[in-house]
Amino acid sequence: MPDLSTSLTLCSLCPKLCSHVCPVYRASGRETLTPQFKMSSLLNLRRPEATATEVEALPIYGCTGCGACTTACLHKIEPAQHLIRGRMTAERADVGHPALYDLPERLFHRAQEASRAILRDPELASRLAQPGEVGLLPSCLPRRQLGEGPVAEAKQLLTVLDRLREHRRDLPEYGLLTVGSAGYALYAAGLDESFRLYAESFAHKVASLPTLVTTCSACTYLLKVVYPQHGVPLGPKVLHLSEFLLPYASALPVVRRLPKVTYHAPCHLSRRLHIDAPRQLLGRICEQVDDLLPVGDESLCCGAGGLLPQTDPQLAQQMADEAIATGAATSPVVSGCPSCGYHLTKSGHPARDLLDLLVEATTP
């Protein structure tokens, strides 16, 4: 990936050759949300004499981090990474997005609530990860920040793994993590200092574990790629739930195969990490698996990433609408990420996530 200075120069001079693949631009139709304009906005914001306003800084928040523009770029520039880290420039200039005000405090509170929710449940409190075991990290969706928190997903994780363990005694010992969050929101907001501190604390808490298993696609990418980029390498190996389960797929105690489904491939798993394990697992538990079109590098982002649902909820919904309309789904949609599934459902397009179906298919 070219460095920031080179990337900004090349992008500002580019005749918008990647605009046609940017899902944010496609859904909005706004010239100010082409990758070229967003990178030019960041270039202007970084000038020593710059006196930017919140309105002028807004374009750099119009990115979900999906990476579609990079696949179309001859220079393999990473506008997503530069724009996300460039949001720190906006924060330092006091022109950060108002929707992200007090984000570190809110994330810390949410992580605490998620941890407490697990510890309050006697069943889950007795299943915490011990040194040497596989650590299970439930997602930290906003809908789970109060009340039950991540309890429902944590119970689903344990249910699937417990059922598998009855047939594969060689499955490693596992337990729940109570860290609450991997800190994706801090990274996506461009709060580098807060994110680095949070990441270092997270890394310390999981240092005694050999493996981390995540359900969220963005957190998987964050832990595998972004942590090391920020100088915080993790000791444990990071696996998405589907990666962890795939070697044991033939032993999954499938009681009944589920009807045909349409698979939604999350950007951070498919385009970023080239992980197709969720689809392969669905093939084990479903009669037929179709794909939400287009597929591969041409797939459309649903709008769940980059904090776009917080900074521009209307645009995030438009992206979900386009992804589903273009996808031509003829059966229920299943996402490889609970965050994507939640966003699609909230946008009026019911979608389930992989874990839901794993529980259903293995229920006697």
Describe each region flagged by the PLM.
Residues 2, 39-214, 220, 226:
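Iron-sulfur-cluster electron-transfer modules
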Residues 9-12, 16, 20, 61-71, ...:
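Cys/His-enriched microdomains
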Residues 21-22, 72-73, 344:
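Cysteine-centered loop/knuckle micro-motif
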Residues 237-285:
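C-terminal amphipathic alpha-helical segment
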Residues 15, 26, 67, 74-77, ...:
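Cys/His-coordinated zinc-binding microdomains
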Residues 1-60:
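Ferredoxin-type iron-sulfur electron-transfer modules and their immediate structural context
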Residues 76, 141-236, 268-364:
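Cofactor-cradling patches in redox/metallo enzymes
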